[in-house]
Amino acid sequence: MAKILQTQAITADTFRTNADTRFSESAFGEQVVAQELAFVQAAPVYDLLPSNFRAYTATGGTAGAENKMFKASTGTSAGGYGAIQSFRSLNYKPGEGAIAKFTALFESNAASSWQGAGLVNLGDELSFGYNGTSFGIWYRHNGLAEVRTITVTGAAGGSENLTLTLNGTAETVPLTSGTVEHNAYEIADYINASVAGWDADQLDDTVIISASSDGAKAGTYSFSSATATGTIAQNKAGVTKTSEFVAEADWNGEAVSIDPTKGNVFKIRYQYLGFGAIYFDIEDPSTGRFKTVHTIQYANDHTIPSLGNPSMKFGIYAVNLTNTSNLIVRSGSCGLFVDGQRVSTRNPRGVVNSQSVGTSFTNILTLRNRRTYNGYINQVEIQPLLLDISSESGSKNFEIEVRSTTDTGVEQNFTNAGTNLVSDVDKSSVTVTSGRLLATAVVAPQTNTIIDLKALGI
């Protein structure tokens, strides 16, 4: 018996009617497909915290890796917490969506506690977790760190102690004779090594300090020393992030039945652009497919952007407020992506320096991505492109090393690399041996060597 094959002419209107309406079209009616670009991918399968992750603990809390999972716990004291964050953020680009995929389980819950797993930065959070005994979604946004600038206006005439008061707490900072830049380095070095709750960057004769948490830090700030003089000015006032918790019973999407004490697969997607929608997805255990369980429908309803900074890190945390039972959050792995290619949108910049060197490794150039930018915590990435080294020696080879480090262990004097840039540069002639070796090359007399830094993925 012959079978009749029915056909239908496919037109643009037919496609729009019959196809998945979530497909995007170009200005010419062509289907647009976005390719995910990974920024963070991690799985602690060797029970070690990856080197590009950081752990935070207090009052008996712990953070690390166990049973091939990230683990954060509160311990059994009120105020205890454990947290883990990726060092790198997904680098949001306007017009490209951002995605987090991860697994998580929450072993238990208790009143007067917080737990979460998802996207975080100092002032924002998009996560699944617990508010006390209620499972749901955390949406925290638009928090700011206190940022101030200490300017050394007069150098110390000898060895003396600076009384530096930060947010009402007096610190005793040893100073020695030298330049204002030298004293600024001493102050920044002391703060980073000895003052909890603050980070510091020396820049010429100034020290830019930023609080390591959001919220107002409106106490007393002062600079008092025997001969050294200085001022402290506020760049940005700290603001406590707005916290919103949407309990599972109040979600507005598809229903998915899960047990949060078991490992589940989660996904968080956001358009940003300032006012785009934010989607929270959970894998349906019965089908292995994601369902959107809740959407923050932000457009046409607000007058300020949904996030203070859309470049976010992966993180898990467990926090005891007044609770004293041990709460544990685990995650098997995570991936952070943007929907699109990595394309530079700014003109490249360069710096140059000449240095006489001997038989010890001597700094020629040090580049730094600063902690703050225009008074805000900096989440922008710098991408080194190339290093061109030439030798004026007529008879000797010399070796060049490229190292990555957060602290050379020697005094350096950073200056601006250019106007309105996040990068600083140091050209001090100091001996440097610390840090992770990234590349090395030998430069022959009267020649030059080029190292492709972009290929190293620094």
Language model regions located:
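Short, aromatic/His-centered strand-loop micro-motif at the edge of beta-sheets
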Residues: 237-265
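Extended, beta-strand-rich, solvent-exposed assembly scaffolds of outer structural proteins
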Residues: 144-145, 149-225, 236
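Surface-exposed loop/edge segments in extracytoplasmic proteins
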Residues: 169-173, 238-243, 287-295, 411-412
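Localized edge beta-strand/strand-to-loop motifs within extracellular or lumenal beta-rich domains
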Residues: 261-277, 283-285
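Extended low-complexity, serine/threonine- and proline-enriched intrinsically disordered segments
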Residues: 164, 280, 391-436
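Exposed beta-sheet edge/beta-hairpin loop segments within beta-rich domains
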Residues: 154, 253-262, 269-271, 449-458
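Surface-exposed ligand/attachment interfaces on beta-rich extracellular proteins
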Residues: 152-156, 176-179, 358-377, 405-412
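Low-complexity, Ser/Thr/Pro/Gly-rich disordered linker/stalk regions
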Residues: 2-143, 242-246, 296-380, 385-392, ...
